């Protein structure tokens, strides 16, 4: 399969997660993405703890050039690349690239067809000067409030705003590229962490508008469904089960010897069952507790009802479905070790997007890329430019 974005040329000035994620989306779909790094490499490479996975996860299928952008020759080399590029992606603080001569106005003058994508903390407005982080905007935009129990705001269990913000940036880039087919002109595209967070909690804002009551944090919420929770099993494990229709309710009751519940008029519809949980939930808890995790999941799956074990990230490496369907990409890390990481969750005509470049070593493609520009590699090295 020819990748959908094959032939697209992208220059990426980014670090951490949001900008690299936007570049990853385009790279996985076939774009030729060149990651521009300082001498010594992007500092994201050296993060530890919770940040140790950022670089390998969000920088596959890219080429790396490490160069001194503050030098006249280094800057000129990258500008030469940008002149022939389709897309430029950056996620630095406001004004940082303008000082280096890589701001939107500078690059628009150089390449009027360029799509310039800025991944920011905030879109235009009173907060746009602020420095933001994923966790800052999760707290600020209401997501942390909705995730933790009352009085204990809690960030989501991944860099969900960075990743989603990167996705919105990539979406904006592709829309601008489509528009360019008719206008012949580039465009400035921006996505931001704060606005991304607010978009994700939009359902709770709408709930307040519809009901007149503010949404409660998820651990304290009143579920829309009568059965939509974790259940303990015989072997002290847990399984989530959701019953979201009257038809599923009948299937559950018949399968677990609870036919008498179907005769109760107060339990006939989901909205009634939400009110009268005390009449049936203890009985379901008791029935499920008689089965092991494996037994309960097998039975629920055979019934066609929604269910899930409580998975951990490290368990996904060996997941049967992911491995069978091309959902994991086997790649070589910077230290030479191999690792399977999630593919982009999209298929085209049933085919998954694959790996064509391992996460690059810092400056791995510097010589290759500069030679294409006809530059003197030895001279650049002697001057410390690369």
Regions found by a protein language model. Name each.
Residues 1-172, 176-182, 361, 367-386:
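N-terminal helix-loop segment corresponding to the beta1-alpha1 unit
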